[in-house]
Amino acid sequence: MTQLLNRSLIMLLKSNIIVQDVQSYVVQFGFEAILKEAISFDKVDVVKSLNKLRAVSTTELFLASSNNALKVAEWLVETKKANVNMCSEIFKDTPLNSAARHGSYKVAEYLIAKGAAVNGYEGALLGPPLYEAVSGKYLNVAKLLLEKGAAVDQRKSGETPLHAVAKNVRYTSKDIKDDEIYKLLVSYGADTNAKVEFRRVGFSIYDGKTVSEIAEFKVALAGESE
């Protein structure tokens, strides 16, 4: 039943019918369900209509960033005055982190233009925006961040973005030097000899290893902890 309702909601959003009588559909589907799907499809008119019924939180900028919902992001920043550098309580990251994590190029570009800090906050649990873009293999977002001044060797849990490339390459037969993101990072001066710093808490199979050592470490260990 839930899946059927979700499919019906998505069809209504795609056809723009829902914006004609959003209050009735809120009764049927629920405010939060409509808001979530409206943002994911970048239906800013629906989001605006929902805002008339109940104030839409500026923290929805995280969801808009994850979904590359540029129109919604613009409305949240320019009309709702959302802070592009707001920090999430759980992950200690910003909307730009969310955009980088999901490869949302258009929103990442917009957020930076509006003053988003390209290096995010120190101590973000999932790493700085560049690390997240590299880890997700989003070359265009990584290039954008570097062009806008992102620190090429900024670490996440002791690892630089080059270490993230090495981890991605590790499970393939590719030579790391042929990887486009590797070449991009090196062109911006990334340290190819950097070692993974030992963590204060926990253990990683990568601790103390260089980029090349990680890339060549092809055999996965049972129960390994990254």
Swiss-Prot record:
Keywords from the named record: ANK repeat, Repeat
The ANK repeat ranges on this chain: 56-86, 91-120, 125-154, 157-194
Keyword Repeat in record: yes
Biological processes annotated in GO: ubiquitin-dependent protein catabolic process
Keyword Repeat in record: yes
Top-level division of the source organism's lineage: Bacteria
A single Gene Ontology CC term: ubiquitin ligase complex
SUPFAM superfamilies: Ankyrin repeat
Pfam families listed in its UniProt record: Ank_2
PANTHER family the UniProt entry points to: ANKYRIN REPEAT AND SOCS BOX PROTEIN 1 (PTHR24173:SF27), ANKYRIN REPEAT CONTAINING (PTHR24173)
Name of the featured protein: Putative ankyrin repeat protein RF_0939
Species of provenance: Rickettsia felis (strain ATCC VR-1525 / URRWXCal2) (Rickettsia azadi)
